[in-house]
């Protein structure tokens, strides 16, 4: 008999432990699950491989080697591949058995260590390439964002001149004014809006020093100083004398009755001094006297007109009486003259 026939005849010699029952519901492709805690039990290997000596040793091909490997016989010449199989071989191998090497198994020969390492290197390379691609994409996106943020417009002298003129006219131009500037300067409207924002920030920063504050600060600070008769700093007065009227409030140091001059005049004669009170009382007395004289003169004029009216009426009455007294004799004379005739 050949080695193949011996392997076929020896199929029913494989036995199972009677203490472990087979659960058909838990049957898997890898084996059966048991209740033990050994490595073979945890890995699902419940069959005990019985050692068997090869018969004549005539099988020189691969099938004969697989049937009589290390003193163990396998049914059908098939070799179960797995960690449990290797562990069972190591545990049940007799001391006189030859050394077990993976090269003895033809199914394990393609999966050598070098091939496994090559596969790992390929996987690592593929993973690293994906990471590099994703990192490059992220870097590209970040660089695009940075480029957009760092994009700056270079203005020409003509554009700056037009923008400065518009800024002196109005610090907050409307949409129509910005569109007109865009047509003049050939700039986009959003660039003009950003330029005005930066220009206002620069102006506010420069106007923070004395005499260059904003309008609210001028009306608040200088108004309080004028109300309380606080002298202004010499720097502002000197700048106004030197002609730097743009550096201070024009209504504060202007020629036509500036508030600073008024505050100086009030400061010379403060309202709490006796001179100022005397002058105020004297002016009030004069005003009262003038009003009294005007009222009395008006009353006297009215009385005179009434007296004149009364006198005129009395004279008219007297004249009428005299005419009545004189009229009868005249009538008698006329009657006498008529009779004589």
Curated annotation (Swiss-Prot):
Motif (Octapeptide motif) on chain: 37-44
Subcellular location field: Nucleus
Domain of life: Eukaryota
Motif (Nuclear localization signal): 147-151
BP GO terms, sorted: visual perception
CC annotations in GO: nucleus
Keywords: Developmental protein, DNA-binding, Homeobox, Nucleus, Sensory transduction, Transcription, Transcription regulation, Vision
Protein role: May stabilize the differentiated state of a subset of cells in the inner nuclear layer and may be involved in cellular differentiation during retinal development and regeneration.
Name assigned to this protein: Visual system homeobox 1
Originating organism: Carassius auratus (Goldfish)
Source taxonomy: Eukaryota, Metazoa, Chordata, Craniata, Vertebrata
Gene symbol of the encoding locus: vsx1
